[in-house]
Amino acid sequence: MNNLIKSKLELLPTSPGCYIHKDKNGTIIYVGKAKNLRNRVRSYFRGSHDTKTEALVSEIVDFEFIVTESNIEALLLEINLIKENKPKYNIMLKDDKSYPFIKITNERYPRLIITRQVKKDGGLYFGPYPDVGAANEIKRLLDRIFPFRKCTNPPSKVCFYYHIGQCMAHTICKKDEAYFKSMAQEVSDFLKGQDNKIIDELKGKMAAAAQTMEFERAAEYRDLIQAIGTLRTKQRVMAKDLQNRDVFGYYVDKGWMCVQVFFVRQGKLIERDVNLFPYFNDPDEDFLTYVGQFYQEKSHLVPNEVLIPQDIDEEAVKALVDSKILKPQRGEKKQLVNLAIKNARVSLEQKFNLLEKSVEKTQGAIENLGRLLQIPTPVRIESFDNSNIMGTSPVSAMVVFVNGKPSKKDYRKYKIKTVVGPDDYASMREVIRRRYGRVQREALTPPDLIVIDGGQGQVHIAKQVIQEELGLDIPIAGLQKNDKHQTHELLFGDPLEVVELSRNSQEFFLLQRIQDEVHRFAITFHRQLRSKNSFSSQLDGIEGLGPKRKQNLMKHFKSLTKIKEASVDDIVEVGVPRAVAEAVQRKLNPQEAEALLQVAEERVDYQTEGNHNEP
């Protein structure tokens, strides 16, 4: 905790409000609310916390606060601040998950469409449905029963759907708007489960068609009746009152929260929404934040009722959702909330079980690898790979895996300094010497295993440096790739031998991940260096363009191509003098500069000729 934070903590009021944590760059990393700002904000800097809260606190270098009149006002402000600033430690609902709806458009001749956008446009919306497939299935059924307009713009002639009885052909139809409103009401009744009237009508039409020997038409009506029956069986009735409601339940454990929302429409459970995330405050308050974001961000209709658990502030939810808010005490609605809570608990337990299995697999992989190589369990593994193209911009990279997982803070990049040309062995010698010479000098923690991305030659070089030059005792293994550039063989021992390794084993998958990661890291560094060198070389020799201005150009435009495409004014905006900006454009676009020069010369010649003709 720095002196600025200590001073500000003394100034905190006991009022409700929002607090805003910032990192060293002034970026907002967390927004929270509190009934008592002094108690809540001070709690971050006192006592011990779990790992995720420690990670948050370690990044806080400043905070601000906003006092509000009430806790509900603080809740609304918090939701807006999160939406505006998108802090990395706050709950952020995914915007890409929107559910499909069936819509009857508000047009003179209405259409039946599927949409993911719910707008206040006078249209009738039904849903949400679990996926587009389910919505399409129902829409196809409705199209066969109700002849709504199919075309976006009514055609001048009757369309194909008119001939198969699925369109009224509005170009020749004499029906008034009241007729279509009536048909829309029938669709609404049907989607609410009130389909007995339609089934009776279809049965009557089927019987009439059979009496007149129109058996194909009768079969069509029969299929429609069966399709409605199938649709009924797919939707489980959860409530007898056939209300539209959202049912919320949540469960917390080990610093994580799971919220489940059941979408119950016309008494039937049609879909659920599941979200798992870490929480930093009181779970009830973080749940309220979630509900506020849910109805602010998610594209779906607010239902007639919202059911919430007992321990949630009902008035706070009412401020967030324009709907009837209930905390059921008993009966069918209470069972729905309990079911949502139970499912939230199951989802959270599944997450922890999967994490435990992942840890077990990773731990088992490094233990098996140790047994296979007859060395202590390699908790820390360091791996190296070189990268160059025909000896240009040679680099090397080191990745570190601790307990079988990447430790990216320990990754290192190396520019090759002493090697000229494409000499992979010499490059490996330099990098191993630099890395473990430093480990020796600074008494750093050595790895339990070194993995070289290469064959016998590279491994021998590494052994010479580690064992003979530096006198260190660190096991060294090599990973060879096959012709398809895939992990193929593990080399180990003295002399080096191929270690038999099952390709389906966890230890093989671990080594494969290590090899892929060090290759990716080395290649990425090499590309960055090549790009930077290319950038520098093409901008060398421009008077007034020093290293700092080159760096600013690259930071702003990201690539040489973007600078080539930029105008002189664009370059000037980065802080480059106009004369220098013009020189940059001439250097990067010589053909264009030559053409402009030629035009200028022709203009001068023309003016000169004109002067000669004067009397």
UniProtKB/Swiss-Prot annotation:
Which superkingdom, per the lineage?
Bacteria
Gene Ontology molecular function: DNA binding; excinuclease ABC activity
User: What's in the keyword line of the UniProt record?
Assistant: Cytoplasm, DNA damage, DNA excision, DNA repair, Excision nuclease, SOS response
Coiled coil ranges (UniProt) are none
Record's Pfam families? GIY-YIG (PF01541), HHH_5 (PF14520), UVR (PF02151), UvrC_RNaseH (PF22920), UvrC_RNaseH_dom (PF08459)
Subcellular location, principal: cytoplasm
UniProt cross-references to SMART domains, sorted A to Z: GIYc (SM00465)
Where does the record say this protein resides? Cytoplasm
- On whether Ribosomal protein is a keyword of this UniProt record, the answer is no
Q: What InterPro entries does the database record attribute to this sequence?
A: GIY-YIG_endonuc (IPR000305), GIY-YIG_endonuc_sf (IPR035901), GIY-YIG_UvrC_Cho (IPR047296), RuvA_2-like (IPR010994), UVR_dom (IPR001943), UVR_dom_sf (IPR036876), UvrABC_protein_C (IPR050066), UvrC (IPR004791)
Q: Which residues form the GIY-YIG domain?
A: 14-91
| Sequence similarity | Belongs to the UvrC family.
NCBIfam families recorded for this chain? uvrC
Function noted in UniProt: The UvrABC repair system catalyzes the recognition and processing of DNA lesions. UvrC both incises the 5' and 3' sides of the lesion. The N-terminal half is responsible for the 3' incision and the C-terminal half is responsible for the 5' incision.
- Please give the subunit comment from the record: Interacts with UvrB in an incision complex.
The entry's protein name is: UvrABC system protein C
